[in-house]
Amino acid sequence: MSAFTPASEVILRHSDEFTQRRVLFAGDLQDDLPAQLETALSRVHTQQYHHWQILSRVLGENAHYGLFASAETLADCDTLVYYWPKNKPEAQYQLQNLLALLPVGSDIFVVGENRSGVRSAEQMVADWAKLEKIDSARRCGLYHGRLDSRPTFDADTFWDEYPLGELTVKTLPGVFSRDGLDIGSQLLLSTLKPHMKGKVLDVGCGAGVLSAMLASFSPKVRLTLTDVNAAAIASSKATLAANQLEGDVFASNVYSDISGRFDMIISNPPFHDGVQTSLDAAQTLIRGAVSHLNTGGELRIVANAFLPYPQVLDETFGSHEVLLQNGRFKVYRAVKSRAAKK
């Protein structure tokens, strides 16, 4: 989160525009531009816990993490800089929340990579603000307008659900497995035997699909679910509640907020951060697993077959095995021995 993203570089081309503004930065923010850009006030709202961790070190209480922006978050702000995500429903969800709280007459800047669909911004907010494209660079578009009226934001209308066997999965925009069980998770689940016991950590839990399915055929497991995405945390809590299942669900940047040890760690680890490919989280997941597993405990993950995880698994655990694979995915298993690196 050190180098500026292309979207932030476009904002920097207009840095003089912001020196007297009280700015709220929100959306798919992936760098520390709010801490670097000269403004009268810089405040951040993010749904990504790992981004909040970094920005809060510099911005302190002006960095906010959570599912929704609050009136307090937007208090005294006269400008919104919104980073367009790769997921259109997520953008709609976040923008309606933000514009419902932003004072009428405030300036709105929307920036994002062309391939992420930022062109949709004009039509999406047309009922409340007229956006015009003011710059195009670094394969990004920058749009500007003023808020003419506030939308009504009803968070309940953005919830979705789908059946999975006898389970109900609850989801919000921007959450992995929002539209159904993905092939990778299905492959991982097929390797889990029924009637398992012990403490299980689900890292990058998304909508809680893996944990809910596991608990449905192994009711004695004790579940801990974590994710960086506030929408995923809310979705997982809702999925467990909808199926009368129990588990601890909270935000953690891989192991940042994890204490204790587990008998199994399961994950379908992400390798995209926004629209950029990143293996950092998955490698942190593997390398840190031995510090959070009991001796004899195992890490079981599913990943795209082309990703370079075998070497990291062997360096960390001493060995690994491929439990199952198809043309696209592999399910890896690595067991913590007494000799495993810590």
Curated annotation (Swiss-Prot):
Its EC number is 2.1.1.172. Monomer. The lineage of its organism: Bacteria, Pseudomonadati, Pseudomonadota, Gammaproteobacteria, Enterobacterales. It is found in: Cytoplasm. GO terms for molecular function: 16S rRNA (guanine(1207)-N(2))-methyltransferase activity; nucleic acid binding. Signal peptide: none annotated. InterPro entries: DNA_methylase_N6_adenine_CS, Mtase_sm_N, rRNA_ssu_MeTfrase_C, RsmC/RlmG, SAM-dependent_MTases_sf, Small_mtfrase_dom. The keyword Transmembrane does not apply. It comes from the Bacteria. This is Ribosomal RNA small subunit methyltransferase C. Its main location: cytoplasm. Specifically methylates the guanine in position 1207 of 16S rRNA in the 30S particle. It holds the Pfam family MTS. GO terms for cellular component: cytoplasm. It catalyses: guanosine(1207) in 16S rRNA + S-adenosyl-L-methionine = N(2)-methylguanosine(1207) in 16S rRNA + S-adenosyl-L-homocysteine + H(+). Belongs to the methyltransferase superfamily. RsmC family. Keywords: Cytoplasm, Methyltransferase, rRNA processing, S-adenosyl-L-methionine, Transferase.
